[in-house]
Amino acid sequence: MKLEEKVKELLSPILEDRGLKLVDIEYITGKRPVLRIYIYNPEGTSIDDCEYVSQRIGSILDVEDLIKTSYTLEVSSPGLDRKFKNIEEYNIFKGKDVVVKTKEPIEDKKIFKGILEGLEDGIVKLKQDNIVVEIPLDKISQTKLDF
């Protein structure tokens, strides 16, 4: 099992305790490896949320000894300008304002702004002025939160 998958498994009960969602896990190797965990709280991700997750997963990782060298653990929110990296994010951020860019024009447009309705059967649903726009996932080049 990959490190990220094992960390995800260990994080699950920690996140559930606080009603948090896992957005992404990155493990960057090098001279000083970094394990980055991105979390989301639908009510607004706070420093307390990040600290809570960091302390708990840090203790568990020390006991499990998954990373055999010293490393830096970072827990944060996804950030304002972060692009979606996985399809789960289309449902994690349901109800949030997003900007979707397509690879080619759809109805003469390549940029769509609206409220994310979610992802279903490979179709991203976006509400614009009370009209739901459906965009095939394979036509999307980039999606990010719109603040």
Swiss-Prot record:
It comes from the Bacteria. Keywords: Cytoplasm, Ribosome biogenesis. Disulfide bonds: none annotated. InterPro entries: Ribosome_maturation_RimP, RimP_C, RimP_C_sf, RimP_N, RimP_N_sf. The keyword Cytoplasm applies. One of its GO terms (cellular component) is cytosol. Gene3D superfamilies: Ribosome maturation factor RimP, C-terminal domain, RimP-like superfamily, N-terminal. It holds the Pfam family RimP_N. The keyword DNA-binding does not apply. CDD domains: YlxS_C. It is found in: Cytoplasm. Coiled coil: none annotated. GO terms for biological process: ribosomal small subunit assembly; translation. Belongs to the RimP family. Required for maturation of 30S ribosomal subunits. This is Ribosome maturation factor RimP. The lineage of its organism: Bacteria, Pseudomonadati, Aquificota, Aquificia, Aquificales. The gene is rimP.
